C-alpha cells in the first residue's frame, strides 16, 4: 500500500514537472500576446531540480539509509 501511494505521488510530480518544462508561461501566446515564440528560450530538461528526487522515488531508495 505504501509503495502504491509513493508511486502515485511520483507520477503526479513527474507530470507536473513535464508540464512546467514543456508549457512555459513565457512561451504561451495567451500569457504574453506581444512576444514571439522564437524569443522564448527553450527549457533544458536536464536543469530540472526535481528529476533526481523523482528518480529516487521511483527506485524506492528515497528515505533509506
UniProtKB/Swiss-Prot annotation:
Residues 24-49 form a propeptide. The keyword Signal applies. Its main location: secreted. Expressed by the venom gland. AXPX repeats lie at residues 23-26, 27-30, 31-34, 35-38, 39-42, 43-46, 47-50. Residues 1-23 form the signal peptide. It is found in: Secreted. The modification Leucine amide is found at residue 62. One of its GO terms (biological process) is defense response to fungus. Keywords: Amidation, Antibiotic, Antimicrobial, Fungicide, G-protein coupled receptor impairing toxin, Immunity, Innate immunity, Mast cell degranulation, Repeat, Secreted, Signal, Toxin. Belongs to the MCD family. Mastoparan subfamily. Antimicrobial peptide. Shows activity against both Gram-positive (S.aureus MIC=1.0-3.75 ug/ml) and -negative (E.coli MIC=7.5-15 ug/ml) bacteria, as well against fungi (C.albicans MIC=30 ug/ml). Also promotes important mast cell degranulation. Shows little hemolytic activity on rabbit and human erythrocytes. Its mast cell degranulation activity may be related to the activation of G-protein coupled receptors in mast cells as well as interaction with other proteins located in cell endosomal membranes in the mast cells. This is VESP-VB1.
Amino acid at each position: 500500500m505504501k509503495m502504491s501511494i509513493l508511486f502515485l505521488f511520483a507520477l503526479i510530480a513527474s507530470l507536473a514537472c513535464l508540464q512546467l518544462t514543456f508549457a512555459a508561461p513565457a512561451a504561451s501566446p495567451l500569457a504574453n500576446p506581444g512576444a514571439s515564440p522564437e524569443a522564448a528560450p527553450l527549457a533544458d530538461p536536464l536543469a530540472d531540480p526535481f528529476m533526481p528526487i523523482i528518480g529516487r522515488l521511483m527506485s524506492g531508495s528515497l528515505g533509506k539509509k
